Regions:
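Bacterial Sec-dependent N-terminal signal peptides
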Residues: 1-22
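A general structural signal for short secondary-structure junctions and capping/turn motifs
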Residues: 2, 72-75, 117-120, 195-197, ...
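Flexible, membrane-associating and regulatory peripheral segments of lipid-active enzymes
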Residues: 17-109, 113
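Surface cap/lid and interfacial helix-loop subdomains adjacent to catalytic sites
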Residues: 20, 157-168, 190-242
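Active-site catalytic motif of lipid deacylating hydrolases and related acyltransferases
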Residues: 34-36, 42, 85-171
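Structural recognition of the beta-strand scaffold that forms the well-ordered cores
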Residues: 81-85, 127-130, 173, 204-207, ...
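Gly/Ala-rich beta-loop-alpha elbow adjacent to hydrolase catalytic centers
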Residues: 176, 180
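Hydrolases whose catalytic domains are alpha/beta-hydrolase-1, hotdog thioesterase
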Residues: 183-187
Length: 242
């Protein structure tokens, strides 16, 4: 394996959400072989269309997300809505962004929801949008990658606007992982923070799987277990993972 492929394989390991059992890392992944083409992603996604949601509490059964041996009946429901942005699942494609066919019967997206968004399932008003995420290779080829990132972010912002209009509670939480955290950072800093009333309703932000310097965020870093209106951030690996 040459240096380029080795770096790409490391990036996949670095940004995946516990997918070691689902992916064959010894295989050669397909990466974009053309420059980013905006003509391929000109049409905006309609978040009134249920197909553009990976999970929504008002249309999906939360039991599909929780561990099969876990009894959620005794859990107290929390009066809060959650907007969860899932991590990268586009590893092998010639396109810089996922298209809507990527949303269909996607076991990797399902696994990410089961491993991560499940903590909110059944006890909150949970929204998880599909979005035209950027290819994992965008972290290597950043010239084309930033353009792909902007497409993905525009979907996130559009879905968040739908979330704001339809969520069942006043207060809300932002939660994200990996690429999702890249989008959450931008959403909080550029869309939520400038709106004082909206900012006051952001109860907590769980920005996981990416390094974040506290100076990168306009909201405060949480300093104690009971602080609200702040963000938590961590990135952890098993010992000797890489």
């Amino acid at each position: 394996m040459n240096t380029h492929n080795l770096l790409f394989s490391f990036i996949i390991l670095f940004f995946s959400c516990g997918l070691k059992q689902k992916l064959n890392y010894s295989s050669e992944f397909i990466i974009p072989d053309q420059k980013f083409n905006n003509n391929e992603v000109r049409i905006d996604l309609d978040y009134n269309d249920e197909k553009n949601w990976a999970f929504r509490s008002d249309m999906h059964d939360f039991n599909r997300l929780i561990p099969k041996n876990y009894n959620i009946k005794n859990e107290k429901k929390i009066n809060v809505s959650v907007f969860f942005i899932h991590p990268t699942t586009l590893f092998s494609s010639k396109k810089w962004n996922a298209d809507t066919s990527h949303f269909l019967n996607n076991n990797i997206i399902d696994l990410c929801l089961e491993n991560q968004a499940s903590v909110f399932a059944g006890i909150t008003d949970l929204y998880v949008p599909h979005y035209r995420e950027m290819h994992i290779y965008s972290y290597t080829d950043t010239i084309n990658g930033i353009k792909a990132f902007n497409v993905a972010y525009n979907d996130i912002e559009a879905s968040f606007k739908y979330f704001l209009k339809n969520k069942k509670t006043d207060k809300f939480i932002i939660a994200s992982h990996s690429q999702g955290t890249n989008h959450a950072k931008k959403l909080i800093n550029e869309y939520i923070y400038p709106k004082v009333d909206l900012r006051s309703k952001l109860l907590m932000s769980y920005l996981i799987g990416m390094d974040i310097n506290k100076n990168e965020m306009l909201i405060d870093l949480c300093q104690n277990p009971v602080q609200l209106n702040c963000f938590l951030n961590w990135r952890s690996f098993n010992e000797s993972y890489y």
